[in-house]
Design a protein with these regions (language model features):
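Conserved catalytic cores of very large enzyme subunits
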Residues: 1-306
Length: 306
């Protein structure tokens, strides 16, 4: 009954996957299976860590992946701030194929992560130097032994993760572009951009096309493949910018931490049919609200592919 209400409750977690992830993530630090099984109440939203031996206060930034689709559409220009944020790569109108547009997106993503990692290092350093949590650090294994607070990487299984949100909005938008502009040719770039610039007001017919394009969460192979490809490319490019703040291998955790609300006013209308100002999609691999229409089993199958 609760699931059917569509409220996003209760939360479903695959604990076998969480244990396996901890074993891989902390393998170089000698984690045991028993330790990996001592998962606490979830760190943050859907993050995982080791109870009494891990910390989750240091972040590598919170990128808005849906915004990167905007940068790809407008060649590094931000319609919200009216500033050229990233170097020009290639105008969307000059991309003869979806693959050309996708390649441009990845290049903008590379610029974004380069800037973000520098900013997050500065923020983490400031937190460590100015507001270290000494009391809590004393309660975590490893801090006293190493003489380091949790902000400095003292816990035995410390981690500094990139909270990656709005990935489903980005994937749905990319598929809508592929479907409507390149595959079926129902729209041109000029038509789509006019509708987006107007926040779909007066272009409700185009919004209907965008909203009706196949979406993540319905067990549609092509959509699921693109969603998975996008997430893997995000991780690959993020990790290419070096280790995390503590010097360990960089990792991501896709979830929202409510940033899907914060990002809403600064993210324009998107090709997935969403209007500017409307909250982006919550959680990690949940469907865009109102678009998972093939039942809960289809949603779970799509989520497992992402």
């Amino acid at each position: 009954e609760v699931v059917r209400s569509g409220s996003g409750q209760p939360q479903f977690m695959n604990m076998n996957a969480a244990v396996a992830r901890s074993l891989v993530r902390f393998a170089s630090r000698g984690i045991t299976l028993d330790e990996a099984r001592t998962l606490p109440v979830i760190f943050g939203c859907v993050g995982t860590g080791i109870q009494g031996k891990g910390s989750y206060v240091t972040f590598e930034g919170q990128p808005n992946l849906a915004k990167l689709v905007e940068f790809a559409m407008y060649d590094g220009y931000d319609p919200h701030t009216r500033k050229q944020v990233f170097p020009n790569v290639k105008p969307a109108e000059e991309c003869a194929t979806f693959e050309e547009l996708y390649d441009a997106l990845l290049r903008h993503m590379d610029h974004a992560y380069d800037a973000q990692r520098k900013i997050s290092d500065l923020g983490n350093s400031t937190r460590e130097q100015i507001v270290p949590n000494i009391f809590r650090s004393c309660l975590l294994d490893g801090c006293i032994e190493s003489g380091l607070c949790e902000e400095a990487g003292g816990p035995k299984y410390s981690q500094s993760l990139c909270i990656t949100s709005t990935g489903i909005d980005a994937a749905n938008s990319l598929y809508a572009i592929k479907h409507l502009i390149y595959d079926t040719k129902q729209l041109t770039w000029e038509q789509l951009k006019k509708a987006l610039a107007a926040n779909f007001e007066g272009y409700e017919d185009i919004q209907k096309l965008c909203f009706g394009a196949p979406k993540h969460g319905n067990d549609i192979e092509d959509v699921d493949q693109l969603t998975r490809r996008f997430f893997r490319d995000v991780e690959r490019i993020y990790r290419s910018h070096g280790p995390d703040y503590f010097g360990y291998e960089a990792h991501m955790d896709p979830f929202s931490l409510s940033y899907h609300n914060y990002f809403a006013p600064m993210t324009g209308a998107l090709p997935n049919g969403r209007q500017k100002g409307v909250a982006l999609t919550d959680a990690s691999v949940s469907a865009m609200p109102g678009t998972d229409v093939n039942g809960s089993t289809a949603l779970i199958k799509s989520a497992a592919q992402a």
